[in-house]
Amino acid sequence: MAGQPLACQLQEEVTCPICMEILQDPVTIDCGHNFCLQCISQVGKTSEKIQCPLCKLSVNKNTFRPNKLLASLAEKIQSMDPADIQAEKEDSRCQRHKEKLHYFCEQDGAFLCVVCRDSKDHKSHNVTLIDEAAQNYKVQIESQAQDLGQKDKKIIEEKKQGEGAIWAFRAQVDLEKLKIHEEFKLLRQRLDEEESFLLSRLDWLEQQGAKQLRQYVTVTEKQLNSLRKLTKSLKIRLQSSSMELLKDIKDALSRGKEFQFLNPNPVPEDLEKKCSEAKARHESIIKTLTELKDDMNAEGKRDKSAFMNSLNKEEKESWSLLQKNNSVLPTSVPVTLDKSSADPDLTFSQDLKKVTLYIVAGKASNRQAKPRPFYPFHCVRGSPGLSSGRQVWEAEIRGPSGGACIVGVVTELARGAQSQTVSAQSYIWALRISPSGCQPFTNCKAQEYLQVCLKKVGVYVNHDCGEVVFYDAITSKHIYTFQTSFDGKVFPLFGLQVACSHITLSP
């Protein structure tokens, strides 16, 4: 029974060392040992001082203190089933010789009494006292526990690095998805623009053809009318008298002979040329698209075949389920720079993908008037913000001596924090990047310095999981992961410190 060892131990605690019975009216003497009041009182009757029967310390008789806790415990022990206590006592004795167990055999891992120790079964074995053996193993256990503790720390660190590597991998996947979305979006946009231009040009040529038809009909009808008038005048002359017929006859005949049909060109060469150019452009596009389709068809089949052959059974099932559900995971959108949130010393490219720090002396008063919540960095937020889901972007850093900057995320709470007791820097999770390395920074506290030289850093944010992952965008190696929880929307954050340095975003 699980309670038997405890029962035996408790009985030993409430046993009087003098009478070896359960304590009666237990008292504690100055040295701390406990006895029956009657038993200890019988020691040294003729003297005011006695020697403790256990430790031999001299104590005064009049200092005996009743021990109510032991008295209560003794009562409880006495109320227990004696069979349980006796069974425990038997467990501490040799089952074969009924002697008390004092020794431990290393070879057999068995407890021995004196008789067992001297027997032929154990005489040649390494036998030590139980307490000594326990002490030896205690040292081994402590050493092993310490080793396991070190392994625990190592596993935790490797787990942290492994999780970071997985987050960096997921960031790469999301970034590749974003690039594909953007490239195909641009391709579709370019095709739509090309289609629109080709059709618009043909619509215009059609309009010009209709206009040319009207002009051609007008010109030819006008000439026909002139010809018919001339013919009619000659026929009338035939019906007149001889004198009337001969009057101005030469002029009349001359007009008939000189009449020429001015046959205009139905379709001008300029329109013919424009139509030919449209057809040529269309044929060129069709040829390019046909080659692209053929190439994509061949390469696509090879790529799909290689991909499917690389999957095991379980992976194929998950792939089939994904295709069946047609559930494409949501992807993030490209990040641009928000000029409205920018430090006045920052300038931007037209596409809002590049920010450069130009410190102009004449703007000093403006800089002093406008608070710099992320001093000494000149900062700008990115757009759009993120209130759920994931977002990924990469930032290339350039400038004198490699530049110095911060890249990370900031919550919308940072806007009003600078005017209150809380610093705006309490709401950022970022890397301070310098030519010699980088340093994670959050809640106004810098973390350990990392000997990682970055030229291009990737940032992956999972709002739902509270993860901000940084990775080397060139090597794809994980750098650092913040694990937190976001209160509201978060935004990309970029800051520059060195004049003429710049950050370029992608995609």
Curated annotation (Swiss-Prot):
It catalyses: S-ubiquitinyl-[E2 ubiquitin-conjugating enzyme]-L-cysteine + [acceptor protein]-L-lysine = [E2 ubiquitin-conjugating enzyme]-L-cysteine + N(6)-ubiquitinyl-[acceptor protein]-L-lysine. One of its GO terms (molecular function) is zinc ion binding. CDD domains: RING-HC_TRIM31_C-V. Residues 315-507 form the B30.2/SPRY domain. It is found in: Cytoplasm; Mitochondrion. GO terms for biological process: antiviral innate immune response; defense response to virus; host-mediated suppression of symbiont invasion; inflammatory response; innate immune response; negative regulation of NLRP3 inflammasome complex assembly; protein K48-linked ubiquitination; ubiquitin-dependent protein catabolic process. InterPro entries: B30.2/SPRY, B30.2/SPRY_sf, Butyrophylin_SPRY, ConA-like_dom_sf, SPRY_dom, TRIM/RBCC, Znf_B-box, Znf_RING. One of its GO terms (cellular component) is mitochondrion. Keywords: Antiviral defense, Coiled coil, Cytoplasm, Immunity, Inflammatory response, Innate immunity, Metal-binding, Mitochondrion, Transferase, Ubl conjugation, Ubl conjugation pathway, Zinc, Zinc-finger. It comes from the Eukaryota. Highly expressed in the gastrointestrinal tract, with high expression in the small intestine, moderate in the large intestine and weak in the stomach and esophagus. Its main location: cytoplasm. A zinc finger (B box-type) spans 89-130. Zn(2+) binds at C94, H97, C116, H122. Residues 176-241, 269-298 form a coiled coil. Pathway: Protein modification; protein ubiquitination. Disruption phenotype: Mice are viable, normal in size and without gross physiological or behavioral abnormalities. Mice are however more susceptible to infection with RNA virus due to impaired cellular antiviral response. Mice also show increased inflammatory response, characterized by enhanced NLRP3 inflammasome activation. Increased NLRP3 inflammasome activation leads to an aggravation of alum-induced peritonitis. In contrast, it attenuates the severity of dextran sodium sulfate-induced colitis, an inflammatory bowel diseases model in which NLRP3 possesses protective roles. A zinc finger (RING-type) spans 16-56. Induction: Up-regulated in response to lipopolysaccharid and IL1B treatment. The keyword Hydrolase does not apply. Its EC number is 2.3.2.27. May form oligomers. Interacts with isoform p52shc of SHC1. E3 ubiquitin-protein ligase that acts as a regulator of antiviral immune response and inflammation by mediating ubiquitination of substrates. Acts as a regulator of innate immune defense against viruses by mediating 'Lys-63'-linked ubiquitination of MAVS, promoting MAVS polymerization and formation of three-stranded helical filaments on mitochondria. Acts as a negative regulator of the NLRP3 inflammasome by catalyzing 'Lys-48'-linked ubiquitination of NLRP3, leading to its degradation. Regulator of Src-induced anchorage independent cell growth. Belongs to the TRIM/RBCC family. This is E3 ubiquitin-protein ligase TRIM31. The lineage of its organism: Eukaryota, Metazoa, Chordata, Craniata, Vertebrata.
